[in-house]
A protein has these predicted regions:
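Cap/lid and interdomain-hinge subdomains that line or gate substrate/regulatory clefts
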Residues: 2, 7-9, 107-232, 236-239
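Short beta-strand elements in bilobed, periplasmic/extracellular small-molecule ligand-binding domains
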Residues: 31-55, 142-148, 205-211
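Short, well-structured alpha-helical segments in soluble
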Residues: 59-71, 88-90, 257-266
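Periplasmic-binding protein-like
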Residues: 71-80, 99-101, 269-274
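Short, acidic/small-residue loops that bind anionic groups at enzyme active sites
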Residues: 89-115, 120-128, 293-308
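Long, internal scaffold/assembly segments composed of regular secondary structure
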Residues: 231-323
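C-terminal catalytic subdomain
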Residues: 296-415
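Extended hydrophobic packing segments that form well-structured cores
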Residues: 370-472
Length: 472
């Protein structure tokens, strides 16, 4: 990614302190279990280690570490029974979910030969899970539980841990990067309009405003011909250009991409929403004509770029790109009633990582509904499972996620330069459109290859945002 971020995950374990002097063998046992648990957390995140906690004072010290690090999530390993006083001081001042990891060491106790120490150390992780959740509820804290076993490996547990870490990456990305708005939203698309202060307060995301006048001049100081040539080749490697492409043909575009990449890094941008509604002449016309493929090159590198000034779908694209590796702007395009299929797509910049074959670039005289004309890019999303995410708001400004899973199928698509795909939903096209529309999304959505609702639900819990699941 052009701007890298790394989630910070708080980790600690708890056990009842009264057990340890009674059964000294539990100390090395629990230390070994805690060390083994930390190794299951992927190195894509930074661990903030709160240690093994058996007293209130140790819990308070763990909490100090978590607060100082501004953790995005907390994993709590339940080693054996422990009172909730071992837990609450560590998370009392945090506003992130606490994931209780109830992972038993062995699959089953030897009922005939197990003594008390062995039971406490190897088979009693479940002892305090309900108590912990009860007190997290009373404290107003968000929570989740993962239950499983160490012996023999447990892929379900590992998948849940990795999923939560992906979700935590979204929070960190929103906190550490900014969203750029160039120009303003498309006039009259009131579903896209947003209160930037509310956005920052609720989603941690800060907006940086930019005028098009600055963008037109952004490439004026780019003189590194080697960098421009390399980027031109990157563009040719990414797209099949109608009528053939040469480095000379995409030179100006490459120069703008190099400039945009520097701008993204300098301004620490994770997302961009843009719309131009002026006279597409001179420098303005040059940039306007090539902005779609230029921004596609940024999307390829992890910076979500949304047309029509839609900051909400830029956020949705960034979420999906972060958790799945793909994030394509889309909207309801048409319905094929003969095949009971929804045609979903959009004109504008796209994500090369979602494309099953080399995307195409072609010139059109007019950008329909917009100023000017120039290059369109068409991507060809993979067949198979697909996830859609829209971000919307209620009358009080609260955000909401609207999600659905479907299956992209082979078949005829439109070929005038816009990305579009044929998606089948289990509820049928007619019912899907009814349900999706009734959920009140913006008219844009983001698409990602694969099934990701379970991860999106974790992202929503981290942000404390409700989710409407339309179909899966």
């Amino acid at each position: 990614m052009l701007v890298n971020t790394k989630a910070k995950v708080g980790v600690f374990s708890i056990a009842l302190g009264a057990y340890l002097p009674q059964f000294p063998s539990l100390v090395p046992e629990f230390e070994a279990q805690y060390d083994a648990f930390k190794k299951t957390i992927p190195d894509t995140v930074e661990i903030v280690d709160g240690g093994m906690v058996t007293t209130k004072e140790q819990a308070m010290l763990a909490g100090d570490k978590f607060r100082a690090a501004d953790v995005d999530l907390v994993f709590l390993q339940m080693l054996t029974y422990a009172t909730s006083y071992n837990m609450l001081p560590a998370i009392r001042d945090l506003d992130v979910p606490v994931v209780l990891v109830n992972v038993q060491k062995i699959k089953a106790l030897d009922y005939e030969h197990t003594d008390i120490a062995s039971w406490l150390g190897e088979g009693y992780a479940c002892g305090a899970v309900g108590e912990a959740v009860a007190d997290l509820e009373r404290a107003g804290k968000r929570h989740a539980v993962i239950t499983g076993v160490v012996e023999g490996g447990d892929p379900a547990v590992q998948a849940e841990i990795e999923d939560w870490c992906k979700a935590a990456q979204v929070r960190r990305r929103f906190r550490e990067t900014n969203i750029a708005q160039i120009g303003r939203p498309y006039p009259g698309m009131m579903d896209l309009y947003i209160d930037e202060t509310n956005l920052y307060n609720r989603m941690f995301l800060y907006t940086k405003q930019f005028d098009w006048e600055k963008m037109w001049a952004i490439a004026d100081d780019i003189t590194d011909e080697e960098a421009i040539r390399a980027k031109a080749q990157d563009i040719l490697d990414t797209f099949d250009i109608e009528g053939g492409g040469t480095i000379e043909k995409v030179w100006d575009m490459a120069k703008y991409v190099v400039a945009f990449e520097k701008w993204v890094k300098d301004e620490h941008l994770g997302m961009i929403a843009s719309h131009y509604d002026g006279f597409a002449q001179g420098k303005a016309g040059v940039l306007d004509s090539m902005l779609i493929p230029a921004f596609s090159m940024l999307i390829k590198q992890g910076t979500a770029c949304a047309v029509e000034g839609d900051m909400k779908v830029a956020m949705a694209m960034s979420i999906l790109k972060t958790i799945s590796g793909t994030g394509q702007l889309s909207e309801m395009y048409s319905i094929d009633f003969n095949d009971d299929i929804c045609i979903i797509g959009h004109s504008g910049s796209g994500d090369a990582d979602i494309s099953d074959k080399k995307p195409t670039m072609k010139i059109v005289k007019v950008f329909h509904g917009k100023t000017g004309g120039g290059y369109l890019t068409q991507f060809y999303p993979y067949t198979g499972p697909v996830t859609y995410l829209a971000i919307t708001q209620d009358k009080d400004g609260n955000f909401k996620f609207v999600v659905a899973e479907g299956v992209n199928e082979e078949g005829p698509i439109l070929s005038f330069g816009d990305t579009n795909m044929r998606t089948r939903f289990t509820c049928g096209a007619r019912e899907f459109v009814n349900r999706w529309s009734e959920a009140g999304p913006t008219h844009h959505m983001a698409a990602a290859t694969g099934r990701h609702i379970d991860t999106i639900l974790k992202v929503a819990k981290i942000f404390n945002v409700p989710v409407d699941i339309v179909t899966r």
